[in-house]
């Protein structure tokens, strides 16, 4: 179908988002066309602001508009415990359950030789620095329960064990092959309380 250039450009832009195919992108583009101009300008500004105003915390790697992030700055949290997750979305999922009160470390990925992602491509070096510089007693490996997540957890556990820090893994109540961000609060809560030492 031939659309005017601005609509085609908007459809192509929407299709860059995950899970958005041509039909959905077309529906969204025409919805934008029907929106009030102020709403469209606000929407466009929100998109630009996300890229311009957010960064990654220099301590833990979580998304933030301040550095360090609000979690790293919160001295009421348990400073002796770090929960390692693959993505910032996983921090948000963990925080929703309101049970875990420690710190986080975001890897921004998982080891995946098939995709050419090795340990040096994820946020492991800064984790090791934190473990040396901070008084951490327990490291909770909350990577996804799939091949990449398990490989990443085992790799980190092998690096950390000689340091003498307790290394635990979330209890399996999480489905194998699933992503942490899609788990409900009850499942996550049971997984964190039933974590096992590696």
Curated annotation (Swiss-Prot):
Zinc finger (C4-type): 57-72
One record GO biological process: DNA repair
Alphabetically ordered keywords of this record: DNA damage, DNA recombination, DNA repair, Metal-binding, Zinc, Zinc-finger
Keyword Hydrolase on entry: no
Cysteines joined through disulfide linkages: none
Gene Ontology molecular-function annotations: DNA binding; zinc ion binding
Domain Toprim: residue ranges: 80-175
InterPro entries (UniProt xref): DNA_Rcmb_RecR, Rcmb_RecR, Rcmb_RecR_Znf, TOPRIM_dom, TOPRIM_RecR
Gene3D superfamilies, per database record: 3.30.60.80, 3.40.1360.10, 6.10.250.240, RecR Domain 1
Membership in a protein family: Belongs to the RecR family.
Function noted in UniProt: May play a role in DNA repair. It seems to be involved in an RecBC-independent recombinational process of DNA repair. It may act with RecF and RecO.
Name the record gives this protein: Recombination protein RecR
Source organism (scientific name): Macrococcus caseolyticus (strain JCSC5402) (Macrococcoides caseolyticum)
